[in-house]
């Protein structure tokens, strides 16, 4: 688990091979102020927007 200050970098792994996220609900709060249903969803957003969104906490924002 890599931390950047108080924020945690999501473990996205090899996202290019993944096209869908699991439906498990484990909300994480991103540095963009959005709540994501799980870490995979945040990774998907990172990849789509090419932004370095980190996790501020393992809960809703």
Swiss-Prot record:
Annotated localization: Secreted
Residues annotated as site: Reactive bond: 23-24
Alphabetized GO MF terms: serine-type endopeptidase inhibitor activity
Domain of life: Eukaryota
InterPro entries in UniProt: Bifunctional_prot_inhibitor, Kazal_dom, Kazal_dom_sf, Prot_inh_Kazal-m
Coiled-coil stretches noted in the UniProt entry, renumbered to this chain: none
Disulfide bonds: 12-43, 21-40, 29-61
Positions of the Kazal-like domain: 6-61
GO-annotated cellular components: extracellular region
Entries under Pfam families matching the protein: Kazal_1 (PF00050)
Keywords noted in UniProt: Disulfide bond, Protease inhibitor, Secreted, Serine protease inhibitor
Stated name of the protein: Probable pancreatic secretory proteinase inhibitor
Organism the protein comes from: Anguilla anguilla
């Amino acid at each position: 688990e890599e931390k950047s200050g108080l924020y945690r970098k999501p473990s996205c792994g090899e996202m290019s091979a993944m096209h869908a996220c699991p439906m498990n609900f484990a909300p994480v709060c991103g540095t963009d102020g959005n709540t994501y249903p799980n870490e995979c969803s945040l990774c998907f957003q990172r990849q789509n927007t090419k932004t370095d969104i980190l996790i501020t906490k393992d809960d809703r924002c």
